[in-house]
Amino acid sequence: MNRNLWIITLSQIFSFTPAPINVFLSGIIGSTLSPVKALQTVPTSLMIVGIAVFSFFAAKIMSIIGRKAGFLLASLFSTFSALLAAYAIWDKNFYLFCLSCFLIGNGMSFTHQYRFAAAESVEKEFIPKALSIVMLATIFAALLGPNIANFNKDLFDDHLYVGSYVSLAVLTFVPFILLNFYEPQSVPRVKKTYEGRNYLQLISQPRFLQAVVTSAFAYAIMSFLMTATPINMHVLEHYSLSKTGVVIQFHIISMFLPSLITGRLLTKFGHSKIIYAGVFFYVLTVIICFFDTSFINYIFALVFLGLGWNFLYISGTGLLVLSYNEEEKFKAQGFNDILVFSIQALASLSAGYMLSMTSWKTMNLITIPFIILIILVSLRADLLEKKLN
């Protein structure tokens, strides 16, 4: 592994810790600070909205100042946002906590650029492996973040969870140190006479469309069900918080641990076949959730949900980086991310409402049309490619 990829991978671990910490704690903190019960999951959703809103700008900023400066800036911004969250909890200010979660999401929009930086640091044939390595690093963030946050939750007397976000500020500052050793690729500066295809031309390309649709709805379906799972388990079905936590931990592990083999599977079988495998795991999730809600079935369902997401998201990202030219990369990446995380944000925001208005079984059935959409777009891309060949 080259040095840049090592640095990107290590930085990804620490930069990604806000996501699992916020998923783990923001709903609980929201339930204690929120003036209205219905708003308790808003901080969690606002982090995702923050990612969606700032994704395009993150790509644009990096196109101007470069990867290294962009990641350094993001590290400082995330540290500030975590400290603001700590102050909001200390002050028992729900609305300031919501703002801090939104800002944490803004910082996370830069973190999602690490996968592109990894792909750019290796030769084309090694892109699937590089993506898998960076995605695998996220599992360490998923384990490291919540455990450190939980360990430090009582750091400040009479101010529960302030220490969790202070420790998050320390974690998000680590990449600022690591990235000083990152060496950006030296690209010869030439006068730009061609800025690449426009957005309509990019989206009309079958493989680009397949990449965007796969990534967007893989994230949307996963977020829709994952956001509702703790509420359905703990609040509606009265499972203990520890059992609910176990299910979420299994889910997060299954999202990233398969990255050990996903890169090799992509190289061997191709992107579309792994997408169909991911769809198969999503279908299994729906079937299990529809017919039974025992503790062991929740574990299996959320593991299959995580595994399906891994196959779909890494395949979608791998397809994306192969579907644009060098001069189009920031435009294509920004366009992809703003669509992916906007759709994810809508799914996450609607999860609590849909659960309260319908049922857990109905929520799972709602995902079926979007699963079919992924299949149809992938089949179309495959058929058009066969015709061209």
What is each PLM-predicted segment?
Residues M1-N2, Y182-V213:
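Juxtamembrane intracellular "pre-TM" segments in multi-pass secondary transporters
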